[in-house]
């Protein structure tokens, strides 16, 4: 079974969000199941030179893009037993950021065509082409509409994964006419047209043999208007080929037993070492070293999607509790400034790190007691999974993958691995925080809850099995 992942980012090469984590971890787990997964991505200038040096030039071809041919170098390398192909074109990929450029429509039109033009030159017979998010959605669309009549492509099946429906790749109509050489028949509501523009993600949904969302709850949510980002009707139409498979975490990276970034390694049977991580975190931020004061942390993009309006509304009420709060992340200036002001107002209780620091993030996961994730929507979420693996109990809103992975503690049965609330309401969140703090001070209950959180399986194993079955069903 030969699978080609077409992605715009991938760990360890380059990362801007959770897509890169998925693209880095899932293929390794599929390989353990006997699936040959290879990955194709742009050769960004942002990729560390050490990784670029590990690749060799495999082939040079031309990619037709509208009226011109564009250079395409195919670089080939291997990391952790996985083969990678990097599409080299400095004009499109020598930039200071992955996305957000005026010509993103052209850049990823080129990349989509380059993926397809490369397939005959990879020395790899592709059974399933698996594209991800808007950046590579048009790979599947172009395969069906322009390449499938060619014997080299006719047997290839397609899977398309929606990691975040909010980002759809919407561009002016000229993209399909000038770059992709698609005629007027593709610019209408049953095809790529979207409120007067062209929508790449829509193309991926229409053309793919199977569509996956990154959690079962998110798969259901995106078929409703509130979450559907104006594609809910289309997703309801194609519901029969839509499924939800929850993401996992890479346990070779996020594992408190082996994590070299944290002060003291530990497992569910050595939680006293977790306390050492808490003291180290308090020392790092200059917080009072109070063992019985819970640390509530957030490691997040500081955006509206992450539920920060709820946090902002009741933050001073949270501060009335005997708690310490650590925020690690960056994003919208209004939230950055708010948390910096709170750190100024509550210097003994609140600390903020604007930006991202991988080593510090691991220490925050290991040293905190509670992890707050009150998202407005959350396709899957990785933060809560990492927190659970480190015995840091999540407080989440019941949406998307948060609903699938965090089960609210039931004091009657003792079951659960976290705390959750249903409505997007600041005082519902506040009540849930109060409830979590109450159980934190009941040490036997808390220790059992932490052990339950840490002993569940958050790896990619079950998800990889589900993807393998999906691929298999397409090939039968």
Curated annotation (Swiss-Prot):
Single GO MF descriptor: alpha-1,4-glucan glucosyltransferase (UDP-glucose donor) activity
One of the Pfam families matching this protein, by short name: Glyco_transf_5
SUPFAM superfamilies registered for this protein in UniProt: UDP-Glycosyltransferase/glycogen phosphorylase
KW Glycosyltransferase (keyword) present: yes
Catalytic activity: [(1->4)-alpha-D-glucosyl](n) + ADP-alpha-D-glucose = [(1->4)-alpha-D-glucosyl](n+1) + ADP + H(+)
BP term (GO), one: glycogen biosynthetic process
InterPro entries in alphabetical order: Glyco_trans_1, GS/SS, Starch_synth_cat_dom
Keyword Glycosyltransferase among record annotations: yes
Function: Synthesizes alpha-1,4-glucan chains using ADP-glucose.
Cited PANTHER family: ALPHA AMYLASE DOMAIN-CONTAINING PROTEIN, GRANULE-BOUND STARCH SYNTHASE 1, CHLOROPLASTIC/AMYLOPLASTIC
Protein name per its UniProtKB record: Glycogen synthase
Organismal lineage: Bacteria, Bacillati, Bacillota, Bacilli, Bacillales
Primary gene name: glgA
